[in-house]
Amino acid sequence: VKILIKKLKTMKRTFQIVICLMLAFWLGQVEANACTNVIVTKGASKDGSCMVTYSADSHQLYGELYYAPAATWPKGSKMEIYEWDSGRHLGQINQVERTYQTVGNMNEHQLIIAETTFGGRHELANRHGIMDYGSLIYVTLQRARTAREAIAIIDEFLQTYGFPSGGESFSIADKDECWIMEIVGKGEELGAVWVAIRIPDGYISAHANQSRIHKFPLNDPENCLYTPDVISFARSKGYFTGKDEDFSFCDAYAPADWGALRGCEARVWAAFNILGKGTFDADKYLDFAFGHNPDNKMPLYIKPTEKVGVKELADVMRDHFEDTPMDFRYDVGAGPHEIPYRWRPMGFEVDGKAYRYERSIATQQTGFWFVAQSRGWLPDEIGGVIWFGVDDAATSAVTPIYTSITEVPECFRVGNGGMTTYSPTSAFWLFNKVTHFAYLFYNRVEPVLRAEIDAFELGSLKLIKEADAKALKMLQAGNRGQAVASLTEFSAKRSEQLFNRWLELEEFLLVKFIDGNIKQQNEDGTFKDNGSGKGIPARPINDIPRERWLRAIVKDHGEAMKVGK
């Protein structure tokens, strides 16, 4: 009996270690490759544009706007490929004779490609391939005009050069169509298997680091494309044994565990909850988002309650599960200023039980983010716009940048600073400084920042109409060069205005909220003085934290703090 008890205790310890290792691995995956995309078809948008959002979330990614002008190349040229995440040299591929201009994740033909990483089965990663997921995006943008062309080119890259990344979900949109393409490697075999589904017009979709394509039509090439061996390969690996029509890409290649639901699908749930109130029953899928009921799967796409605009879409990217059961502004970890952030690592253990913090759409480690717009009713020089921002989406604004520009605004230029090199003219470093101050007194500072964000973005929506009209007249008069110069100037000027406003905010916030106080202001925005006329401020305001926070302090340290008689 003693031997049996000893064995059982050993088994219990081993099981706990395994669970902790699994949790640690999942948390590492979420932290390393945690991004969010929302996709809006033209029939679901206010102005008839196709839109894609992307938050590139990484603790090692610098926020800058990539730019590659159109170019011609000698026949037989090669292109060096470097892994986007690490900078590691992966090899060479054949270059084409002409490449298109790219600005961020868009090109001159208004094609958009964004991604989120889901990993999938570990044994399917091919470490010897050349085309990592970042290279697939940016090289494909240089070669494709439409979403369908992009899918075909990505497939050619995968089968020819191999795929050294984990499972990926790509958002691919052009002037007319929006697609989700999901890819996994084939282990030591060259190539990859994938499936791509077109989002029906009038609908929206989203993905956030978990495969979302389950069953798909096998004979509908207008709406669904896939590799010929997507099912047979799963059979050969023992991932699937049923009928072809019952095949689920996600279940075969990236089966969702608790972490995938709680840390990833919950973000999709949040986006659907915001944009689909009245058409999407969020309560119905709450147990799925919490990770309790993996069989209660959410749909791949939904119809939004109302048509979606750039501003509404940008605001989705600022979500922290506010006013939902996942809202984490009011537990003790939020502090007295109700900060909806938890510093890494995401998971911890207490008394042998594992816990994890929330992972919302908005997060502190965003390098850059955007709302990309493909406006097919306008010429390509004007129609492609990437509303670009850096750092945490909840405390930063996006500014419109046309994809026909001839140079990137200085504050977003590649080489203007880096993750280990500070630059005073870099938007990434400026926004990080302001945001880090906001993290100190979040529920005081965030409303101020949000008002500034709203004013800037709403103002940009008005100004871009004027910029569109001005450039269109030039194009219609045959003055393409003038039109492009005008759009380049507008993009640079608006970016500079954003940068300068945040410089002012940095100073203002420090003066107003220094040392945990709130300085009083006059109606004209100036700070009140005490009446002496000597620059001494009026008595500052000190707000009192919620009773829940005070009770937590008393529970933790009350005896030492109790006021005596």
Predicted regions and their residues:
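Bacterial N-terminal signal peptides that target proteins for export
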Residues: 4-19
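Bacterial N-terminal signal peptides
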Residues: 18-28
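Sec/Tat signal peptide C-region and signal peptidase I cleavage site
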Residues: 28-34
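A contiguous strand-loop segment
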Residues: 35-133, 153-308
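Short, well-ordered beta-strand elements within core beta-sheets of diverse protein domains
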Residues: 137-144
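Glycine-rich, aromatic-lined ligand/substrate-binding cores of catalytic
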Residues: 235-389
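Substrate-recognition/cap regions that form aromatic- and gly/pro-loop-enriched pockets
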Residues: 334-472
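Histidine-centered catalytic/metal-binding microenvironments
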Residues: 453-565
